[in-house]
């Protein structure tokens, strides 16, 4: 009786997590390889592929299997469409690796780390997808970084390519504090899947300190960080920006923050008039942080809350999606 109850509980946990993962993938017209799905299950759900497939097939979810992936619904994208999204993501990643150091030369030292998140980090991109960035600045550098980045992008970024969106920029103390608290399964996956462009050691150290991420997705955590050596840098105690630059950062803050809020209001007004409610977003501007959070991503977070092992503390967000790009 006890073994049966335990097995039923594990089935329920597995199914709840799988439903959330597949539902989120469906939001982006995508699916999941069963092996990748296994890597996203919590501890205690030790499934092999045949057991997982059997559980999914008797779950009642409308599922389709195509190209080695499982999809929600009866009309999965064709193999050609899947390959096209994967190829576009690789092209965008190659472009970002080439262009970011060139365009932001002289700006990157303001940061502790810079990573790509969103669809590109997951290896699939559509024609309309932006490139989402998550940046952690040195103390006193958030608004200076944003200002210099927007200027550099306007002047130096002359080659065609996907839109760059610096959707979350946090001062390092804010990032350390935020990543130390449980943010739920969806955020754990987003944070782990981020692809580092600058300050990789720093970012790895942050993740190694975030034990809640390991508890939430142990297999993926081990796959991403299990062989990583102890980083040579600490996520705390780094030198702040020199005081003249901190003063400039403070002077820029009220003007650039106001500008971004106005841009956000204008964009949202246009989205409402055009019947594009899913593209609405919030603009969060504080002295030590700036975030854009889309309504679509808020819904994804809510979808994933029931799949979290540790109840999330989502008073603030690690990152946003698809905010405005003032450099365009």
What are these regions (language model features)?
Residues 2-12:
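Intrinsically disordered, low-complexity serine/threonine- and proline-rich regulatory segments
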Residues 12-113, 117-128, 137-328:
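Catalytic core of pol beta-like nucleotidyltransferases
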């Amino acid at each position: 009786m006890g073994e049966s109850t335990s097995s039923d509980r594990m089935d329920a946990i597995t199914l709840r997590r799988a439903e959330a993962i597949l539902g989120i993938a469906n939001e982006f017209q995508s699916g999941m390889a069963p092996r990748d799905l296994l890597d996203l299950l919590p501890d205690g759900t030790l499934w092999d592929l045949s057991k997982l497939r059997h559980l999914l097939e008797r779950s009642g979810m409308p599922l389709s299997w195509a190209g080695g992936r499982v999809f929600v619904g009866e009309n999965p994208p064709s193999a050609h469409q899947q390959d096209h999204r994967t190829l576009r993501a690789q092209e965008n990643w190659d472009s970002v690796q080439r262009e970011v150091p060139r365009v932001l030369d002289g700006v990157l030292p303001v940061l502790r780390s810079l990573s790509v998140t969103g669809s590109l980090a997951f290896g699939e991109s559509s024609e309309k997808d932006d490139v989402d960035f998550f940046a952690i600045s040195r103390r006193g550098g958030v608004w200076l970084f944003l200002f210099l980045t927007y200027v550099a992008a306007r002047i130096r970024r002359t080659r065609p390519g996907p839109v760059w969106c610096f959707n979350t920029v946090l001062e390092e103390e804010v990032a350390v504090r935020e990543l130390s608290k449980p943010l739920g399964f969806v955020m754990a996956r987003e944070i782990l899947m981020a692809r580092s462009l600058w300050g990789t050691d720093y970012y790895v150290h942050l993740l190694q300190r975030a034990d809640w991420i390991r508890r939430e997705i142990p297999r993926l955590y081990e796959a991403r960080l299990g062989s990583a050596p102890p980083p040579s840098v600490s996520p705390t105690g780094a030198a702040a920006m020199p005081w003249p630059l901190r003063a400039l950062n403070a002077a820029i803050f009220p003007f650039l923050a106001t500008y971004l809020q106005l841009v956000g209001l204008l964009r949202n007004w246009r989205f409402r008039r055009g019947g594009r409610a899913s593209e609405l977003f919030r603009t969060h501007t504080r002295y030590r942080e700036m975030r854009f959070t889309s309504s679509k991503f808020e819904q994804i977070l809510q979808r994933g809350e029931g799949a979290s092992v540790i109840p999330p503390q989502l008073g603030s967000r690690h990152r946003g999606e698809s905010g405005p790009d003032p450099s365009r």
